[in-house]
Amino acid sequence: MAITLSATSLPISAADHHPLPLTVGVLGSGHAGTALAAWFASRHVPTALWAPADHPGSISAIKANEGVITTEGMINGPFRVSACDDLAAVIRSSRVLIIVTRADVHDSFVNELANFNGELATKDIVVVCGHGFSIKYERQLRFKRIFETDNSPITSKLSDQKKCNVNIKEMKASFGLSCFPIHRDDAGVIDLPEDTKNIFAQLFSARIICIPPLQVLFFSNCITHAVPAVMNIGRLRDPANSLTKRAEKWLLELDERTPRAEKGFFFYGEGSNTYVCNVQEQIDHERRKVAAACGLRLNSLLQECNDEYDTDYETLREYCLAPSPHNVHHACPDNMEHRYFSEELCSLEDVAAIAAIANIELPLTHAFINIIHAGKGKINPTGKSSSVIGNFSSSDLIRFGATHVFNKDEMVE
């Protein structure tokens, strides 16, 4: 099946604005995938959108709406993409493929793509967010190059999946991007290949910072998301059918006596108070200590937040209370399967696995890993990380961008 890629704002733009000679296939139609597809279309980049049959995102609605996505916020108006069921057709028609999905379901996307390895050798893939995609999957997939963003370039939320509406709250001022195989300039500095720089300039308006693939694993979302989620875990409703009849009756009585707040809960503004921010900063210290053991110098959690949005918040609590972009909607976990307890768990376990290679202890990080597993009722009796990086050696880490791997006894505080 051949597909005709379209990328038009409606009504059609002025005649002197010609489409760019670039075609993109977005794989994943959740909040960020839908928003990025519309963003690329707004920049006149022909865009196809694909998702697996069981994907909970918006692709069915987009197909029913003839490929039209309506946006509000940073860009406004309807934009048309080509929603497609045929992954092979998307691969053949796209110069660049962009995976936009949770890290804890990367396996299923990789399994789908591996069926087309013969056609991937000339393709570049961008993974948003990467979470160590190249480290984990480069041997299973035969892409020309694997690029990974350290964070999503876009902050967005599907506001009405039935009508394909998405609120694009912010475009990041900057984000990190890695390339594997690692490319270096004439001076030996890690850089993006020259033939890709114009492509990324067409796709994104942000300042792109080239980083090694290993550094992608250390991005701080696992702290800003998982820590407040765990520390507010008591807000979650009990799982369906988990209560006895008597317990259900008593819960109803409690709700009648003191009804739960009708208004929503602002995850950042209300869920990350000063005490929670203190915990985040301590776990951030552990994160940066492990990165330093690999020769990677990371900015603090607060500095990363300010760099992303080009802001000057003085404290992490101030950042969490800012009206936009994180307190626009009541976006908060409602069960233990939410990505803050799943995707970010993968990242915490990856950092812990690297720490084990460097023989560094992470008491707080391990505590949060164990609490998430315990909350899911799946505590690992061996205490061993499920991260594939647990099987790596120091030389493996160096292959993906570590300059060295110090043992903790060699490190100077």
UniProtKB/Swiss-Prot annotation:
InterPro entries assigned to the protein according to its UniProt record, in alphabetical order: 6-PGluconate_DH-like_C_sf, 6PGD_dom2, G3P_DH_NAD-dep_N, NAD(P)-bd_dom_sf, Opine_DH
Keyword Signal: no
GO MF annotation, one: D-nopaline dehydrogenase activity
Pfam family, one: NAD_Gly3P_dh_N
Single biological process term from Gene Ontology: glycerol-3-phosphate catabolic process
SUPFAM superfamilies (UniProt xref): 6-phosphogluconate dehydrogenase C-terminal domain-like (SSF48179), NAD(P)-binding Rossmann-fold domains (SSF51735)
Coiled coil: none
UniProt entry keywords in alphabetical sequence: Crown gall tumor, NADP, Oxidoreductase, Plasmid
Alphabetized Gene3D superfamilies for the sequence: N-(1-d-carboxylethyl)-l-norvaline Dehydrogenase, domain 2 (1.10.1040.10), NAD(P)-binding Rossmann-like Domain (3.40.50.720)
Reaction(s) this enzyme catalyzes, per UniProt: D-nopaline + NADP(+) + H2O = L-arginine + 2-oxoglutarate + NADPH + H(+)
Family, per entry: Belongs to the lysopine/nopaline/octopine/opine/vitopine dehydrogenases family.
Subunit structure: Homotetramer.
Protein name: D-nopaline dehydrogenase
Annotated organism of origin: Agrobacterium tumefaciens (strain T37)
